[in-house]
Amino acid sequence: MNISFVCVEDGITALGFRKMVSLVKSIHPSTEACYIPLTNQYNPLRFLLKPGEHDRIYSDADLNSIASHLAKSDLVCFSSMTAYSDLTKEIIQLVKKTNPKTYIIWGGIHPIVHPEDAIEYPDAICTGEGETSFKLFLSSFKKGEDYTSTKNFWFNNNGKIIKNDFLPLHTSEEMEKFPFMSYAEDYELIYKQDKGFVPTTTNDYLSSFGLGNTYDTIWSIGCPYKCTYCANNKFIENDKDYRKLRHPSVDYVIAEVKEVL
């Protein structure tokens, strides 16, 4: 069984996405990561120089090429924010049209904040932290067992929506066991116009991060604040314990940096 994880957003930083890909790759080796950046320039400084620019750059031919590649997988898992949800919906529909047997999951910020909107398009959405819940889903999915009771997931079963409750948030001890994020691996692909999905290169990373030869990571999860512009409001609404900071040990993050070096 082949799995494609797909990130639809500006650039290829995608820290949460990278964490998920590393974890899934560790339990299911036949997994690839596909990045679909939405602008020609991935540099985050663009947001200072050209604020509000999120124009889609892909032609219908590009979208069909993207869908054709993804439709070869048995399981396709999208991740996107709300700003890129319309494009994600369009790609999901094209993948389904190309291969109706491909099972599609949508995770990331948009399905968490707007689950009622997101569930209309894929077979399932992830509405909370994905590491443990996806492992539970995948175990049942691969065995041919019923997976529709998996917590942190909603399912669209031919128009019948199944809404499951949330799992407890990951503890610091559980986070300690997660693999490090994936960078520059041979299973990472980036979509480029007129070329299709090609392996990521050093230049792709440097232009994406925009600040030279840097390494981005994230150590802690959780926040006590409710800023109006942030999705943290929804996280706290779903589980009040999201206000608490959680993180693996200092040794964990030191080991992560050493591995990169």
Give residue spans per PLM region.
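A short, glycine/small-residue-rich beta-strand->loop->alpha-helix junction that serves as a flexible
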Residues: 8-16, 80-85, 213
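Glycine-rich beta-alpha loop elements in corrinoid/cobalamin-binding modules
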Residues: 32, 38-40, 55-172
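Radical SAM [4Fe-4S] cluster-binding motif and immediate context
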Residues: 173, 183-261
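A short, Lys/Arg-enriched amphipathic alpha-helix followed by its capping loop at the start of a domain
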Residues: 20-31
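N-terminal pre-core extensions flanking Radical SAM catalytic domains
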Residues: 47-53, 226-230
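Generic structural signal for well-ordered alpha-helices
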Residues: 21, 66, 88-92, 215, ...
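Conserved SAM/AdoMet-binding glycine-rich loop
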Residues: 1-10, 32, 75, 105, ...
